[in-house]
Swiss-Prot record:
This is Cysteine-rich protein 3. Pfam families: LIM. SUPFAM superfamilies: Glucocorticoid receptor-like (DNA-binding domain). It comes from Homo sapiens (Human). InterPro entries: Znf_LIM.
């Protein structure tokens, strides 16, 4: 199975992929849109579906004016040096400024993002509560509390950028994603199947695979 990298449009195979913003990338193609530094899955900012490093680029382009991530002072930003492979100079006009937010009438549901004096926070897709910068992890293009990023089926806590997804919902790779959406023909070990889904042993490509350090027998 392979995917198409959003950056270079070349195939991405399982062994070389990293997942971020709901897409699969080559590891070295996941770069900041502005300064082209290599980013870690789940450890970067995003705007309009594009990845940015938190500082200085996201803060300089989209952060509250005059306040940095820590809430004190101003962003000090020097334009980045273009990488050797980049021949087109970047200019501020190539980035769309954030649109001003308008207030909601009383009684309306709050938007998925809210403004605070320290910047912008998001609402966690898992629990619906605000996610602040110091506690967030990013996956599938959204910000989560770390304990809320769980497999939809077995509820195991997941690591950002190291899990599967289907229709924007996170799943562990094995066994849940394979069980629900993988090629048909796999089945749980007969000793562990009693009309209920048992996640510890899984039959893949003719082999019994032990998961989470449970013994196979």
């Amino acid at each position: 199975m392979s995917w198409t990298c959003p950056r270079c449009q070349q195939p991405v195979f399982f062994a070389e992929k990293v997942s971020s913003l709901g897409k699969n990338w080559h590891r070295f193609c996941l770069k900041c849109e502005r300064c082209h530094s290599i980013l870690s899955p789940g450890g970067h900012a995003e705007h309009n579906g594009r990845p940015y490093c938190h500082k200085p680029c996201y803060g300089a382009l989209f952060g509250p004016r005059g306040v940095n991530i820590g809430g004190v002072g101003s962003y000090l930003y020097n334009p980045p040096t273009p990488s050797p492979g980049c021949t087109t100079p970047l200019s501020p006009s190539s980035f769309s400024p954030p649109r001003p937010r308008t207030g909601l009438p009383q009684g309306k549901k709050s938007p998925p993002h809210m403004k605070t004096f320290t910047g912008e926070t998001s609402l966690c897709p898992g629990c619906g509560e605000p996610v602040y910068f110091a506690e967030k992890v990013m996956s599938l293009g959204r910000n989560w509390h770390r304990p809320c990023l769980r497999c939809q089926r077995c509820h195991k806590t997941l690591t950002a950028g190291s899990h599967a997804e289907h229709d924007g919902v996170p799943y562990c790779h094995v066994p849940c994603y394979g069980y629900l959406f993988g090629p048909k023909g796999g089945q749980p070990h007969p000793r562990h199947w009693d009309g209920m889904y048992m996640p510890e042993v899984w039959h893949v490509h003719g082999l019994w695979v032990c998961v989470d350090n449970f013994p196979c027998g």
